[in-house]
């Protein structure tokens, strides 16, 4: 593989030089790091990474290639992938192509050969930053100015970029429940888990109205993960608030961005984390069962603990930084978690939440 020099310039002027793989050219976005050892395919195709360049802390990436069934959506959403070493050799009984070839076909840049430990420390200490990767320009001052001109994630509604254009249904022949899932950037494995729990899932556009949803006669509402600032997605917040007000026996379950939107709908506030939670090894305490769960996480915003209104009960707490990881309404059948119980990649400690959702639908259906 021919080595093409590439440069990464952060908005603060820090420079990292390496080589490009995948697509050569230019990429922009917010730089975040992910601590997962595996799962790069799922990470790249997770719509929640829209507008972000992902640094993998594990030093060797690409060694098991790309498999046909592990995408979390139909395309790569991350702006770029940054690694210490990109493996030219891949081996896995299901893999059909290399990471390099996949990125190249998708027009997505990869950057290898940089000191990722140094970059991660800088992000950890100074916060997630906007940046530019380029094989076309070596002018640091110009690239720094370009990075500084990238829109900040705060105030950015990216949901409209990733949501489905058309409603679609993923059926289960033995389905007992009909779930309407708002697509704010939904992952494939979430739909798969809902199917496994006996749900027919109708996936709808993020701007679908409460009237349209209720006309589908759902047994439950699911609020998906997604990218950007939850506070900017005002249409979703208003719809969730209306759904909860109009039907007090309709279960609502939110994950990640969906958790933040549900919290905002009931009057809580959100804020941007310094560098976010991105990885598959975050310990969370379940305050209801007094147990610890190892969780998969991917979010740059969080719900403000002090802003939780009286009707919302804190159910889960992050043991790294004590941030809100789960809430439930004290009277309405509404609950949510900040992390990803469906994992992909990650542990399966929290799969029980899908069962709790179906049990809630069963109880209120009868």
UniProtKB/Swiss-Prot annotation:
Active site positions: 256 (nucleophile), 340, 342
Gene Ontology molecular function terms on file: ATP binding; carbamoyl-phosphate synthase (glutamine-hydrolyzing) activity; glutaminase activity
Catalytic activity from the UniProt record: hydrogencarbonate + L-glutamine + 2 ATP + H2O = carbamoyl phosphate + L-glutamate + 2 ADP + phosphate + 2 H(+)
SUPFAM superfamilies membership: Carbamoyl phosphate synthetase, small subunit N-terminal domain (SSF52021), Class I glutamine amidotransferase-like (SSF52317)
Keyword Amino-acid biosynthesis assigned: yes
Region annotation CPSase: where it falls in the sequence: 1-174
Gene3D superfamilies named in the record: 3.40.50.880, Carbamoyl-phosphate synthase small subunit, N-terminal domain
Start and end residues of each Glutamine amidotransferase type-1 domain: 178-366
Entry EC number(s): 6.3.5.5
GO biological process terms, semicolon-separated: 'de novo' pyrimidine nucleobase biosynthetic process; 'de novo' UMP biosynthetic process; glutamine metabolic process; L-arginine biosynthetic process
Binding site for L-glutamine: 48, 226, 228, 257, 260, 298, 300-301
Described function: Small subunit of the glutamine-dependent carbamoyl phosphate synthetase (CPSase). CPSase catalyzes the formation of carbamoyl phosphate from the ammonia moiety of glutamine, carbonate, and phosphate donated by ATP, constituting the first step of 2 biosynthetic pathways, one leading to arginine and/or urea and the other to pyrimidine nucleotides. The small subunit (glutamine amidotransferase) binds and cleaves glutamine to supply the large subunit with the substrate ammonia.
Protein name: Carbamoyl phosphate synthase small chain
Biological source species: Chlorobaculum tepidum (strain ATCC 49652 / DSM 12025 / NBRC 103806 / TLS)
